[in-house]
């Protein structure tokens, strides 16, 4: 991380240039110029600035306006085209560039791909009426906006407009906390106001190799009882964010050590074996997993993490957690399928391929992958063969072929096609001619 002396506007502008693609940087300068023309201070605030300073910057950032962000975004759209989406209650607007924007902008840096979009936010203050409540929002100053942040490391702002481009604004000790590697809230009631910050504190601590400040550990211990007052959706969202991280195993272990997991729900387990399973997700996925889908809207890593973490629980415990933490239907069913599968794996270890396929075909593929990662050695070969080969075995004969042979549509179709697949799986058929001979016999039987 650069020293305090290196964080002058020129050096910050240089860091920004290194972190952003040319098209984003050019558009940022354009937006900064537009803000100057309207007399609006414009900033990047929070996580992007934090990550810029520790060398991990991405492309996800909000542009904070000391003024009316919605009006500013609409004026940009009127001048440069694109679509604006407004959330008036929060004073936010999203500007998505489109082909019309490309025609109006004289920037020769655009390349094919996803067109940039920018989120504009009015500087605002927040008030929490009671622990765990969503905040009441109203327009405010930059100081107000920084003061509503969760941790001091997220209170750094980078000014963009005019002569101030690259100026680092640090009103609340964020730079010192970042340099010391401390996760610290802004005020003693912070964890009580929003108990999800407890989970976020651990997430930041483990992601960056920081330490939660000693006084914060005391505040967390006093506030963790308020986790029970949060909705299942909010808690699950925080768990989703943790499970998407590379250091998810360390994060969950830390939460367990602080007695936070049982504070979320008494049935949430943790042990060293689960830690090793989640760490295994850092290894490249086997080739046999090609084509394995996500669990609908749940990314594959997050879905697998839930399955490895909770998939050995009893069905009644899974149902309880799924209800309390507002799991999606697809995650609930995958967990229940995996729980049942674990009980059957010993019997599948020496079974015929057709028996294995009959048992696994109704199980979500991601649950089969989780079983492969967590199963004892005797079950590994059948799970690997299913994922790599057996699930793709199909007879050459189709329903259209049966129609051509004069067989009227009905239950016999499924019986015939299933019998042909079983014969291929169990090695009873070697050639297409073998299949045709068996097909003739099956048609005569029905």
Language-model segments: which ranges?
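Catalytic cores of the polymerase beta-like nucleotidyltransferase superfamily
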Residues: 1-446
